[in-house]
Amino acid sequence: MKKLFATIVSLLTAAMLLAPATSMAQTKSRLAQILERGTLRVGTTGDFNPMSLRDTTNNTLVGFDIDAMKQLATDMGVKIEFVPTEWATLVNGLVSDRYDIFSGASLSMARAKTVAFSSPYTYVGTVPVTLKKDGAKFTDWASLNNANTTVAVSMGTVFEQQARALFPNAKVRAVEKPATGFQEVLAGRATATITSNIEASTLVKTYNTLQMIGTSATMKEARPLAYPVPQGDYVWLTFVNNWISLKQAEGFFDSLEAKWLTAK
């Protein structure tokens, strides 16, 4: 597989060398720039647990996307530089050439107007969370939809809307901040809460009495996560897409999901 990846790099590099000299003079592909520079610049926020977060014990970045970007740099044979950014300036950082790729974001049409997105590498969606001791009673979405269950969610969120639509036979309790749905479950005032699979994976690792029901295959309102890159550079976008395809075939992203996103 590594030989195949090296072959792709060689072919893309050869294609760039064979391009018309005038075109190359005007526009050098980002892939060529990165290989020439010897450093892959990755924008990241460090506040998207467990995808990109800062380990306060040693002040280093860790997470699903951090591991993925480190592997991308390794496979390219270059060093990695993480460039701090904010969600509000994610797009601007790519447009202004502060970094070559962003460490993963949900694909949206609004963002896609300004930046390009790679192929999806995983999906984020809504999942239920209950007490682990109730695991035998609640095994799927349907098992929660009855008059004897109470689903707690934060008031005014998308999860409140989803809970009312998904559980018409259950009691839906919307709680105001600073209360949260999962705290209501921990306190025994609610049977379940619903949240993103990203947050759920963190909750079940933090609170060993909680469990996430189902898997990525059974979550609701699924939307893809992909790597944003600058628009217009199809050599770089194709390279990233090829890398994702190869890593998916190798099981690399499955291993990251097991490490960071799967409830244990």
Residue ranges and their predicted role:
Residues 66, 81-92, 138, 173-187:
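Short helix-initiation/N-cap motifs at beta->coil->alpha
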Residues 89-92, 105-114, 161-165, 186-187, ...:
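A ligand-binding cleft/hinge motif common to bilobed small-molecule-binding domains
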Residues 52-58, 69-78, 140-141, 145, ...:
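Ligand-binding cleft/hinge of the Venus flytrap
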Residues 123-127, 201-245, 261-264:
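Periplasmic-binding protein-like
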Residues 25-105, 113:
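Extracytoplasmic small-molecule ligand-binding "clamshell" domains
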Residues 25-29, 158-172, 212-215, 242-264:
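Ligand-binding clefts/hinges and TM-proximal coupling segments of bilobed small-molecule sensing domains
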Residues 40-41, 76-79, 85, 96-104, ...:
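Alpha-to-beta junction loops
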Residues 131-149:
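Flexible hinge/capping segments at coil-to-helix
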